[in-house]
């Protein structure tokens, strides 16, 4: 999916508002995903999935870091997330639909914390960006 110049500006604008909360939002996104889509828990059998667990916070930090990396390299998301794509496709074998679930939950978290920033245009841009990230992460699946 091709992001327009306006999309890129909108995505960078949202992430500038997220700022120092990215790790917190990453953990909240995971908690929402595990609640709304309980089948996603199967990839984390060794995790304490209770609210506020250290493992969810740590993985939320990784999710946030990957999204920030994608934003920082918005013109080359595939290059920025290549190793992560390999990991998810070849080692973890995560069902690709889970990236859509994660993206949806991230949109909800952004909407809760920054409702005025999530205009229809920004929402569409952020959704396109998250779809692009999901596409990159599933590109190496066979």
Curated annotation (Swiss-Prot):
Q: Taxonomically, which superkingdom?
A: Eukaryota
Tell me a Gene Ontology molecular-function term this record carries.
organic acid binding
Cite the binding residues for heme b.
88
Q: Which UniProt keywords apply?
A: Heme, Iron, Metal-binding, Oxygen transport, Transport
Domain Globin per the UniProt entry, residue ranges: 2-142
Pfam families, A to Z? Globin (PF00042)
Would I find Transit peptide among this entry's keywords?
A: no
Could you give a single Gene Ontology term from the biological process aspect? hydrogen peroxide catabolic process
Q: Let me know which tissues express this protein, per UniProt.
A: Red blood cells.
Q: List the disulfide bonds.
A: none
Task: State the Gene3D superfamilies in the record.
Answer: Globins
Q: What's one GO-annotated cellular component?
A: hemoglobin complex
Which annotated residues bind O2?
A: 59
Family from the record? Belongs to the globin family.
| Described purpose of this protein according to its UniProt entry | Involved in oxygen transport from the lung to the various peripheral tissues.
Q: What is this protein called?
A: Hemoglobin subunit alpha-A
Q: Give the organism the record lists.
A: Anser anser anser
Q: Which gene encodes it?
A: HBAA
